[in-house]
């Protein structure tokens, strides 16, 4: 399953970019990152067999194990692409939220989009390592 990060804003070079690169290098699943301008630009069209997750402070809070189980179930169910969308400062429109398969949050706090991207990269590494049985995540699997 392709893990596709679609993010508003350019990450450039900096500590957040280094974290994203470090964690995404560890992920063995197919992956893609699409950067869009802060305003305008078109989100790439979703292909058949894809799922879209929006990262939003008002979304569902999932544990790392729940996130891993979601990805594993989608992969095993034939989902070809999981799209993770990180919005700009104003978040997502009601239509975008309505069209998403899932809206999740990394806690109740508001995070800058560059930090959210780094946190997503770490959670993708953690989830795929849990699925692979790698000892990175110390909590037992459900």
Curated annotation (Swiss-Prot):
A matching Pfam family: SPOUT_MTase
Keyword S-adenosyl-L-methionine found: yes
- GO molecular function terms attached to this record: rRNA (pseudouridine-N3-)-methyltransferase activity
Q: Where in the cell is it found?
A: Cytoplasm
Q: Where does S-adenosyl-L-methionine bind?
A: 55, 87
Q: What is its main location?
A: cytoplasm
- UniProt subunit comment: Homodimer.
Q: What does this protein do?
A: Specifically methylates the pseudouridine at position 1915 (m3Psi1915) in 23S rRNA.
Similarity field: Belongs to the RNA methyltransferase RlmH family.
What's the protein called, per UniProt?
Ribosomal RNA large subunit methyltransferase H
Species annotation = Sphingopyxis alaskensis (strain DSM 13593 / LMG 18877 / RB2256)
Q: Which gene encodes it?
A: rlmH
């Amino acid at each position: 399953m392709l893990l596709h990060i679609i993010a508003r804003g350019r990450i450039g070079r900096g500590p957040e970019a280094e974290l994203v690169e470090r964690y995404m290098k560890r992920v063995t699943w197919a992956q893609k990152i699409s950067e869009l301008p802060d305003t305008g630009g078109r989100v790439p069209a979703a292909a058949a067999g894809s799922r879209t997750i929006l990262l939003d402070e008002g979304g569902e809070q999932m544990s790392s194990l729940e996130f891993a189980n979601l990805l594993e179930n989608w992969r095993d169910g034939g989902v070809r692409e999981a799209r993770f969308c990180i919005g700009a400062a104003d978040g997502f429109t009601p239509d975008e939220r309505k069209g998403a398969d899932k809206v999740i949050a990394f806690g109740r706090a508001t995070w800058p989009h560059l930090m959210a991207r780094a946190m997503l990269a770490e959670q993708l590494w953690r989830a795929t390592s849990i699925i692979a049985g790698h000892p990175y995540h110390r909590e037992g699997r459900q």
